[in-house]
Amino acid sequence: MFGIRSGNNNGGFTNLTSQAPQTTQMFQSQSQLQPQPQPQPQQQQQHLQFNGSSDASSLRFGNSLSNTVNANNYSSNIGNNSINNNNIKNGTNNISQHGQGNNPSWVNNPKKRFTPHTVIRRKTTKQNSSSDINQNDDSSSMNATMRNFSKQNQDSKHNERNKSAANNDINSLLSNFNDIPPSVTLQDWQREDEFGSIPSLTTQFVTDKYTAKKTNRSAYDSKNTPNVFDKDSYVRIANIEQNHLDNNYNTAETNNKVHETSSKSSSLSAIIVFGYPESISNELIEHFSHFGHIMEDFQVLRLGRGINPNTFRIFHNHDTGCDENDSTVNKSITLKGRNNESNNKKYPIFTGESWVKLTYNSPSSALRALQENGTIFRGSLIGCIPYSKNAVEQLAGCKIDNVDDIGEFNVSMYQNSSTSSTSNTPSPPNVIITDGTLLREDDNTPAGHAGNPTNISSPIVANSPNKRLDVIDGKLPFMQNAGPNSNIPNLLRNLESKMRQQEAKYRNNEPAGFTHKLSNWLFGWNDL
């Protein structure tokens, strides 16, 4: 505020104005808490006496110190006066506020406060200025405590929510890692309620027969539907379907027994092939498979049917997918190239040394295979006869059960049926069908009768397994133009008769010389 300059010491304390505000601020802050008493004039006198009793060497320093102390005391007095003035002003202001509206000071000075959760009743009684200050302090402290309390409540609730959310997250994670299926499914509820008449799309993997039977029922029964979560449902449905199949089979067997026996005897036909070496048995079976479908499961035929022997499996014979009387649907799961019910059955294989039984699915295939009787295959003469139970028992040396007696058929019935269709067809001129002996011309037989086709060939069909095919010498085509009344000389007949006479004479009058015998032995003329 102002400076004091000393005449004796100009360099010690030149300016005190810079220190005055600091002292005033310090005194002001202290005066707000507690007012200080004013210094007594006796203290000043003591300082003066102390200064007067000092020696001459320290006189200058004492004068300067006393001057500074006096200046500080004076400034403190000024600060105390200003504090008193402020207190008086505050008191008058508080009195004026109480006189105007009887409201506390915090109403005129609103602040952003946090609204507590509970309503607090505030007292508005008339008090003095000191009580107002205490009330303000108490209200501020109360508001602070309420804010802290509400904040703690919010923090606790937030923590509880976070803990519950964390627990829910943990539970959800634990439930996701749980692989155990639910104990009750929608299928179980539907089984309990038994409502609805249309099954869901997920249950359409039931067999075709079973789904076809469900259309005849009025309501949908979920007990007969496979359940993914119920292993016993498949066994139960299999038993139901098996019982249904058995009932249908018994009914069909009693009603169609005659029809089944006739169809069985007319569909399967078996033959016996013999006379071949064992080294060409696979080639022989493959050769006879070209005439028709062989029912026996030979390994050599699997690759030809598109079946790998390493992964070959025989499927069950019972039908769980289709109705037995329904011929438009597959009877069961079949392999490639097997589309009927008879192919699923395991047929017995009868074979031995240089003989084998082959069963065809049609009589026409068996008749075609019988034509291979007496032919040469891979350098071996083979025979082919129709199947009979007695023949196989003699070849195999064992007794055949009636269940395994499959493939016996009546050849004459098919021969008579095929004779009517082939009777109008002329036989080849160089083929003669005989009953076991070669048909030869007699010398007394006229040439005209020999050229007549009706006298040469019989009306028996050419593919009969009981007949033998023989080839004649080939002179018949040249003799067909000679009639019974023809005067044309038969040169061929005369030449042939002369050659035969000369040959007979030569054999009867053959010379017995050593040279002739040696030449015949060397050149082989004796074999001619």
From Swiss-Prot:
One Gene Ontology term of the biological-process aspect is: cell division
A Pfam family cross-referenced in the UniProt record is RRM_Nup35
Mode of membrane association? Peripheral membrane protein
Q: Which residues carry this modification: Phosphoserine?
A: 458, 464
Q: Where is the composition biased (Basic residues)?
A: 110-125
UniProt GO molecular function? phospholipid binding; single-stranded DNA binding; structural constituent of nuclear pore
The FG repeats lie at: 2-3, 61-62, 195-196, 274-275, 291-292, 523-524
**Composition-biased stretches (Low complexity):** 23-50, 127-141
Region entry Disordered, spans: 23-64, 88-144
Q: Which PROSITE patterns match?
A: RRM_NUP35
Question: Which ranges form a coiled coil?
Answer: 490-510
* Primary localisation category: nucleus
Q: Which Gene3D superfamilies match?
A: 3.30.70.330
Locations listed in the record: Nucleus, Nuclear pore complex; Nucleus membrane
Stretches of Polar residues bias are at: 51-64, 97-108
Q: What else is known?
A: Present with 2740 molecules/cell in log phase SD medium.
**Record comment regarding domains:** Contains FG repeats. FG repeats are interaction sites for karyopherins (importins, exportins) and form probably an affinity gradient, guiding the transport proteins unidirectionally with their cargo through the NPC. FG repeat regions are highly flexible and lack ordered secondary structure. The overall conservation of FG repeats regarding exact sequence, spacing, and repeat unit length is limited. FG repeat types and their physico-chemical environment change across the NPC from the nucleoplasmic to the cytoplasmic side.
- The protein here is known as Nucleoporin ASM4
Where is the organism placed in the taxonomic lineage, from the top? Eukaryota, Fungi, Dikarya, Ascomycota, Saccharomycotina
